[in-house]
């Protein structure tokens, strides 16, 4: 039997640190791109695996 470990949600600040950008950049990406962000109440939350896949896809570039 395989065990699946649930991935934790991270905050917008943690997402910015993970990607090496400012929080304002993350906010701009939320408005202008399809960054995998999930609004939970008033807060934006992210999954590291989704962010990494998004960056690898090349969609993080803003024209």
Feature annotation, model-predicted:
Residues 2-28:
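Polyanion-binding surface elements
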Residues 7-8, 32, 43:
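Helix-turn-helix/winged-helix DNA-binding modules
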Residues 26-27, 46, 51:
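Short amphipathic alpha-helix starts
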Residues 31-32, 56:
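Residue-level detection of the helix-turn-helix DNA-binding "recognition helix"
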Residues 38-44:
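Short Lys/Arg-enriched helix C-cap and helix-to-coil transition segments
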């Amino acid at each position: 039997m395989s065990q699946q470990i649930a991935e934790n949600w991270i905050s917008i600040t943690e997402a910015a640190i993970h990607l090496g950008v400012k929080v304002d950049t993350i906010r701009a990406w939320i408005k202008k791109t399809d960054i995998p962000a999930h609004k939970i109440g008033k807060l934006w939350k992210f999954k590291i695996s989704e962010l990494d896949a998004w960056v690898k896809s090349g969609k993080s570039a803003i024209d």
